[in-house]
């Protein structure tokens, strides 16, 4: 697994894909330490991708993982735009349909796990299908 340096220029140390995979792995471990159970990672369907799908009790949690070196331009959480939210909602809708579910039949939420520098922020229920 790629090492995540505390500071530094990822372009010199890791490819963008490797850095993304490393942050997603760190997010998974962190969420598991908080009691969530892993279901899937990097779920791709036509039109989008979900970084992590976890379970929190009976709730299916779709997780967007974001990293920014600093909060200078709003930090990691600010990078989850309305457009990105719509893509995540669409992707989750298609994934649920493949599982014979829907937003009406499955208790679910959308979380954002934001790494800004060395800080982690967990935004539970950051947005929903009514946003």
UniProtKB/Swiss-Prot annotation:
- Gene3D superfamilies, from UniProt? 3.40.1350.10
InterPro entries, alphabetized:
Restrct_endonuc-II-like (IPR011335), tRNA_endonuc-like_dom_sf (IPR011856), UPF0102_YraN-like (IPR003509)
Could you tell me one molecular function GO term of this UniProt entry?
nucleic acid binding
Signal peptide (UniProt feature, chain positions): none
Tell me one Pfam family matched here.
UPF0102
Recorded family membership: Belongs to the UPF0102 family.
Q: What is this protein called?
A: UPF0102 protein YraN
């Amino acid at each position: 697994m790629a090492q995540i340096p505390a500071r530094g220029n990822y372009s010199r140390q890791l490819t963008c894909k490797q850095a993304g995979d490393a942050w997603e792995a760190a997010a998974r471990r962190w969420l598991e330490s908080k009691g969530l159970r892993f279901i899937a990672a990097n779920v791709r369907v036509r039109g989008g991708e979900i970084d992590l799908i976890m379970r929190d009790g009976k709730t299916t949690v779709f997780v967007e993982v974001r990293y920014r070196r600093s909060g200078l331009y709003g930090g990691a959480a600010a990078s989850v735009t309305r457009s990105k939210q719509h893509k995540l909602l669409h992707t989750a809708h298609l994934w649920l349909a493949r599982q014979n579910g829907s937003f009406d039949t499955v208790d679910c939420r959308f979380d954002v796990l934001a790494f800004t520098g060395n800080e982690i922020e967990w935004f539970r229920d950051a947005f929903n299908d009514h946003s």
